[in-house]
Structure formats: structure tokens, C-alpha cells
């Protein structure tokens, strides 16, 4: 589903307000890094809007000293909690910006399945 450029850029502006640069690149994985960059395709889809908001959720935790990036890489139990936190931040952000949430649950469910790789999570 397509959203307007204006709505998508509202989300991107939140990252910029937090001191994080949004880099548009469809050849790289959607991600946040501790150099304060989020990479996302320049495509105005609801899926990309959800993904961008999720990465901003990581930024929020990082700037509030609530995300240990090294632990995120090496501890699957920690990662699951960090991912859930980012999704909660994303939901609140999207709701505040009045981005449609009718595909939110199915999107998040499909992404969360990737984090539950047992026995690594236990």
C-alpha cells in the first residue's frame, strides 16, 4: 500500500529531530546504526513507513541510553526485548503522526517471527 510522500517524510523528520540521518538506499538492508544513520528505501509504502518508524524506535532507545548495541548483537534474549521496545515506540509514533495502522499487526507479526530463533532466545 502506498502512502503520501508528505506522510512518509513526517516520519523521517522525527529521526532527523533526534539527530539521526536518514539515508535512502534500496540496495541495503533497512537498519539503524550507532553512528546515528537509518538506511531505508526511498519508497512511500506503508511497509517502509512501519520499518522506518521501527528503526526510529531503536534511535529513541539509543539516545535515552536504553539500547546496548553490542548486547543487541550478541544476546538474543536482549535483542527480543530491544525489538519489542522499538515496535512499541514505532506504534506510538505512527499513531501520533496519523499513519494508517490497519496493516500494522500483520507486519509486526511477520517481523517478530525472525527474532524467535530457539534456543538462542532462551
Model regions and ranges:
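Long, well-structured alpha-helical subdomains associated
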Residues: 6-7, 43-46, 91-122
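Active-site scaffold of zinc-dependent metalloenzymes
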Residues: 1-48, 59, 63
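Short secondary-structure boundary/hinge segments and terminal tails
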Residues: 31-33, 69, 112
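Histidine-centered divalent metal-coordination motifs
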Residues: 54, 58
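Acidic/histidine-rich
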Residues: 51
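Short intrinsically disordered terminal tails
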Residues: 1, 63-67, 120-122
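Post-HEXXH active-site segment of zinc metalloproteases
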Residues: 62-92
